Amino acid sequence: VLLVAADPAFDGHDPGPGHPERVARLRAVAAGVAASGLEDAVVPLAPRDATRAELGRVHAAALADVVEALSARGGGVVDADTVLSAGSYAAAARAAGAGLAAAEALERGEGTAAFLGVRPPGHHATGSRPMGFCLFNNVAVTAAALRTGGARVCIVDYDAHHGNGTQEIFWDDPDVLYVSLHEWPLYPGSGRLDETGGGAGDGATCNLPLPAGATGDVYQRAFDEVVEPLASRFRPDWVLVSCGFDAHRADPLTGLALSAGDYGALARRARQLSPGPGRTIVFLEGGYDLDAVRDSVAATLPALVGEPAEPGEAPTAGGPGDDVVDAAQLRWSAEEA
């Protein structure tokens, strides 16, 4: 059983005409769910709002105050990328709570995995600042809640952009392993190979900054030689995935070269990092070509429940990035030694 979250509240966040992070993205997600061939396995999950206390585990109270105040007066501009409307606080609180609802449902044994079609996305939001289309850090809110119960959490982020907010929030936490595969150089400018965490969390952050044109075979090597060995040593209780479909070769904002077939393979590999069924939650982050989002969702969902995907785009190969994987493998194998 795959739990899939959707909610009308997400439509209430409107950053304005021409903004790439638009409501139509969720229509593409819904089309991908319909095309996945999992009609009999998908169970709707009703999200709930994250409370101020739950947001407060990762965000300063002032951040939530700003989002709520701007929404209450009909909207406003945080920065050139991050624009709010009257419904933005409600959408963001519901998006941040979707992962909490998913974790609660999975802990009750109600599903094998969960896919959360939420917006606004979250991984750029820092502890104190909304940015990069993101208001609250959805994956971080869920990880922090799981941590209160003593769980060790692995966050795998394969959005094309580095999740600077998630990295910052868990920078010194040894019980949250944050792994990001992203395009470099690209917004927001963080995520270098030598950014590995600090204090007690040194070694619990792993970045693989890949060049434009990187293909699925490079990602598979990264999982084989870096991500899986790291996760195996870390032994997570939960795996949370920041899944941006903007690494697809058709995406208008980025230069990576993945296909829908590659996204299916990535979801399968991410699920295999978890200790067993019912411990994987996938959060929608970026992805701005609607056809690519639809096709990538259709390939992702079967992988989360161990089903073969419908025939679609083949996995890709032949792009650059092996040198980055080589360097990361050398760095992290030295860490193991």
Annotated model-derived regions:
Residues 1-5, 11, 65-337:
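A general "terminal functional-core" signal
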Residues 1-56:
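N-terminal low-complexity, Ser/Thr- and acidic-residue-enriched intrinsically disordered segments
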Residues 48-72:
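Charged, often glycine-rich, active-site loop that binds/positions anionic groups
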